[in-house]
From Swiss-Prot:
Binding site residues for Mn(2+): D377, D379, D444
Gene Ontology MF terms in the entry: 5'-deoxyribose-5-phosphate lyase activity; DNA binding; DNA-directed DNA polymerase activity; manganese ion binding
Catalytic activity: DNA(n) + a 2'-deoxyribonucleoside 5'-triphosphate = DNA(n+1) + diphosphate
Name used for this protein in its record: DNA polymerase lambda
Organism: Arabidopsis thaliana
Sequence segments annotated as region (DNA-binding): 213-227, 295-298, 418-459
Recorded name of the encoding gene: POLL
UniProt record similarity statement: Belongs to the DNA polymerase type-X family.
Length: 529
């Protein structure tokens, strides 16, 4: 019998690895099979032994997605006799991300709470983690969007051409080993990528979403991001939150955040938000910050000039062309785009792209690729497999789309592929219309050389929690990561790490980037962290 159990254990642990000495039992409830297998492989590679059959006295750690999953698997009575440490999978993710074992005490699951006597009957699969990308284009946060979009860029135009962000096509990177994403060919393949968290606590996430927008408008991106990180955690929580005691072990939910949640579940409102909404300056700056192209500095200047409404801004001569368009189509741009509409527009772009340049690869990234139900805008990531034909494509593509009356107004247009400047990336930001409609939608195109396409696809798929984690992980290993590559970081004369090197590592697929950084592979629809 002992021999049989031995065959079920993962073989050959590294005796000197980070997890050496650990014997781990992994609760499968709420975890996708592929993710579970990856975690097991990582544990074994780094020294742990996996116990597949049952929790024996040799088991040192039991990992679970949450307390409900643990209770559902074993029951409270049986758990009370375990000598192993009961811990969240988040501990494993954070350890793998940082490259060293995280403090176990912060991830322990406790079973002595009276409110957990009865486990829930059904538990949704959850795949999680967390991030923020560098300052980039500003759009109003919606709980359905899940993208954090930072500050205004140069020339007061919203969104730097070098800064990835927002929404797009299904989970299309067919397999981790393939470099070019493929378009799904059936409703079945598309539906499997849809992101559907339990979302039982919109009373909390909607208030946090409003605070995100206010803090962004005030230029306080760090505070804004703290609420942004908390929202996916709350969205994925499998039950209605009635007490903050339910959240004490969750990542990204600190004491201040728990105090806000307690006030919301107790009173149905948040005094901090009410204060902001009654403050004329905050209210006005927040409103102006919702205009495409207007960041915190510009919003404050407009307020100090005496403007208080969007109607006032229509007579403001200092607005740029892009800001005037953002003002003119303010309501259109704020209107979210249904998933089906994004899919149809993406297919139109692929068809026109193929007519313009056979073999071109066009993928809609961002929230849509991550499986969200709606998008704030469309982020289109483009390349060509031969590594050369993408040069000059965007100019011809935009011209054709304008002839079709699909692209209507330009915001930003910069080309570098033919000159070889700016990493050879071409950029177009503008407004488009769905066929048969006049409602303006925001659309961005980024055309990448094939050899850096994987970096662009990761960056423009997001989410921003993931992007930030990957950047920090790269920095910890002596690299700088952005949408154009992974570069060895140079050092200043004082020995401090400075700017990035000039040559990027050659990593042709998203999975190769994840693997090099040592971050567990996530399918696009798993990246709503």
């Amino acid at each position: 019998m002992a021999a049989k159990r031995g065959r079920n254990r993962s073989p050959s642990p590294d005796p000197e690895g980070m997890f050496a000495g650990m014997v781990v039992f992994m609760v499968e409830i709420g975890v996708q099979r592929r993710r579970l297998q990856i975690w097991k492989q990582k544990l074994v590679q780094m020294g742990a032994v996996i116990e597949e059959d049952r929790v024996t006295k040799k088991v040192t750690h039991v990992l679970a997605m949450n307390l409900e999953a643990l209770l559902h698997k074993f029951g409270k009575e049986r758990l009370s006799h375990f000598t192993a440490r009961l811990m969240l999978y988040q501990w494993l993710e954070d350890s793998l991300t940082s490259g060293e074992k995280a403090n176990e005490d912060l991830y322990v699951l406790k079973i002595d709470s009276e409110e957990v006597d009865k486990p829930k009957k059904s538990l949704p699969a959850i795949s999680g983690s967390e991030d923020q990308s560098s300052p980039q284009k500003r759009t109003r946060y919606s709980p359905d969007a899940g993208d954090f979009k930072g500050v205004e860029s140069h020339s007061n135009t919203q969104g730097s051409p070098d800064s990835p962000t927002s929404c797009s096509v299904p989970s299309t990177s067919a397999s981790p080993g393939e470099g070019i994403a493929e378009t799904p060919t059936s409703p079945q393949s598309e539906s499997t990528s849809v992101y559907k968290p339990p979302d039982l606590n919109r009373n909390i996430t909607e208030i946090f979403g409003k605070l995100i927008n206010i803090y962004r408008a005030l230029g306080e991106d760090r505070r804004s991001f703290s609420y942004y990180k908390a929202i996916p955690v709350i969205e994925k929580f499998p039950t209605r939150i009635e007490s903050v005691d339910q959240l004490k072990h969750l990542p990204g939910i600190g004491k201040a955040m728990r105090d806000h949640i307690q006030e919301i579940v107790t009173t149905g409102k948040l005094s901090k938000l009410e204060h902001f909404e009654t403050d004329e300056k905050v209210r006005t700056i927040s409103l102006f910050g919702e205009v495409w192209g207007v960041g915190p500095a510009t919003a404050l200047k407009l307020y100090e000039k005496g403007h208080r409404t969007l109607e006032d801004l229509k007579n403001e001569d200092s607005l740029t062309h892009a800001q005037k368009l953002g003002l003119k189509y303010f309501d259109d741009i704020k209107t979210r785009i249904p998933r089906q509409e994004v899919q149809e527009m993406e297919q139109l772009l692929q068809r026109v792209g193929e007519e313009t340049l056979p073999g071109v690869n066009i993928v809609c990234g961002g929230s849509y690729r991550r499986g969200k139900a709606t998008c704030g805008d469309l982020d289109i990531v483009v390349t060509h497999p031969d590594g050369q034909s993408h040069k000059g494509f965007l100019t011809k593509f935009v011209k054709r789309l304008k002839e079709m009356n699909f692209l209507r107004e330009d915001l930003i247009f910069s080309t570098h592929s033919e000159e070889g400047t700016d990493s050879g990336v071409d950029t177009y930001f503008g407004l488009c219309t769905y066929p048969g409609q006049e409602l303006r939608r925001r659309i961005d195109f980024k055309v990448y050389p094939r050899d850096i396409y994987s970096f662009g696809l990761i960056a423009w798929t997001g989410n921003d929690v993931l992007n930030r984690r990957l950047r920090l992980l790269a920095e910890s290993k002596g690299y700088r990561l952005d949408d154009t590559g992974l570069f060895p970081a140079t050092h200043s004369s004082s020995g401090n790490r400075g700017a990035r090197g000039t040559a990027s590592l050659k990593l042709s697929t998203e999975k190769q980037v994840f693997d090099f950084l040592g971050f567990p592979w996530l399918e696009p629809h798993e990246r709503n962290l």
